[in-house]
């Protein structure tokens, strides 16, 4: 009976060994099964192989719970655990590794390393990346405004589709990224887009057919183009009215001016008989440098000019220097040049 019992036990052990995938790997027979244990998420087993009963440690697979049990991953298998996709991989040297190979976003979708997701209407970005050799999920506030898988920095503009399908006057909305009071970034509607033409809110533009339009905001976030008369584009300066696209020379300011969609634009400077482009510097008398500035003429002098004196804030400004003489100029309302119409 004792010999019969030992034979039955040996048969059972051999049947169990044949069913285990681990024994498809490289080692010799006969062998004897011993205990299993888990260390660092890898499940191991002692065996004794060969006629001499040599002890050997065999890695069976990966244990996601880090606890010894019947359920474990075999090499090449994967599992979803703790916001990551883990894989049990066997290296060329036969060593098993249990590691995260991908992230899982808030919707349960797989994020591969290097991918990002936008959260909270684009104000927060979720990253899936390798940090210090390990795959991690990192959430950070977006350094800009998010739209269509793109982050736009502060003050940058982009085009979004029209939100009102019944309005055919525009093809899209011109958006711009703002960061009020150094808080979160916000995207605001700043203009209308038709074709490749963009017009800021309350500004004017000209369509391909020659007609003029004005971009208006009917309600918050909704813009449209309205027909405009060319007279609405005129400019006013020193109690004079100038038609849109007209040009003239202002002798007092020493500048050539142009009326552009209701805004006065300084095109060049006039210094004596010379016409200087915006931004050019030239040496002038009294060891000074003259800078043609887009808003006001600038004289840069290292030496003291005795004829200059400090005046009250409501006093007369000084005009251009002509033949080393100071020419007084009446106060005026300074106009700031704005670029209201641009091409994409």
Swiss-Prot record:
Superkingdom of the source species: Eukaryota
InterPro entries found in the cross-reference section: Mig18_Fn1
Pfam families (UniProt xref): Fn1_2 (PF23003)
The protein's name: Uncharacterized protein B0280.7
Organism: Caenorhabditis elegans
Lineage: Eukaryota, Metazoa, Ecdysozoa, Nematoda, Chromadorea
């Amino acid at each position: 009976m004792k010999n019969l019992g030992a034979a039955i036990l040996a048969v059972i052990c051999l049947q169990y060994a044949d069913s285990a995938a681990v024994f498809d790997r490289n080692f010799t027979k006969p062998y004897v099964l011993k205990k299993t244990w888990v260390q660092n998420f890898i499940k191991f087993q002692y065996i004794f192989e060969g006629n001499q009963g040599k002890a050997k440690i065999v890695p069976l697979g990966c244990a996601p719970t880090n606890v010894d049990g019947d359920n474990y991953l075999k090499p090449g298998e994967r599992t979803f655990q703790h916001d990551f996709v883990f894989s049990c991989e066997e290296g060329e040297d036969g060593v098993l590794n249990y590691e995260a190979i991908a992230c899982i976003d808030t919707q349960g979708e797989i994020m591969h390393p290097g991918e990002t997701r936008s959260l909270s209407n684009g104000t927060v970005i979720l990253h899936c990346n390798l940090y210090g050799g390990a795959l991690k999920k990192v959430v950070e506030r977006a350094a800009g405004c998010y739209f269509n898988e793109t982050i736009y920095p502060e003050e940058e503009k982009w085009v979004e589709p029209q939100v009102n399908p019944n309005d055919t006057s525009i093809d899209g909305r011109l958006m711009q990224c703002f960061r009020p009071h150094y808080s979160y970034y916000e995207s605001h509607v700043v203009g209308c887009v038709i074709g490749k033409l963009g017009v800021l809110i309350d500004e004017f533009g000209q369509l391909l057919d020659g007609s003029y339009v004005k971009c208006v905001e009917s309600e918050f976030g909704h813009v449209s183009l309205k027909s405009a008369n060319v007279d609405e584009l005129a400019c006013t300066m020193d109690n004079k009215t100038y038609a849109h696209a007209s040009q003239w020379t202002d002798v007092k300011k020493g500048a050539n001016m142009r009326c552009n969609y209701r805004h006065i634009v300084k095109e060049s400077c006039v210094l004596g008989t010379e016409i200087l482009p915006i931004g050019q510097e030239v040496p002038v008398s009294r060891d000074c440098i003259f800078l043609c500035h887009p808003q006001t003429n600038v004289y840069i002098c290292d030496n003291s000019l005795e004829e200059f004196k400090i005046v009250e804030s409501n006093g007369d400004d000084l005009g251009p220097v002509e033949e080393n003489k100071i020419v007084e100029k009446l106060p005026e309302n300074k106009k700031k040049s704005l670029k209201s119409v641009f091409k994409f």
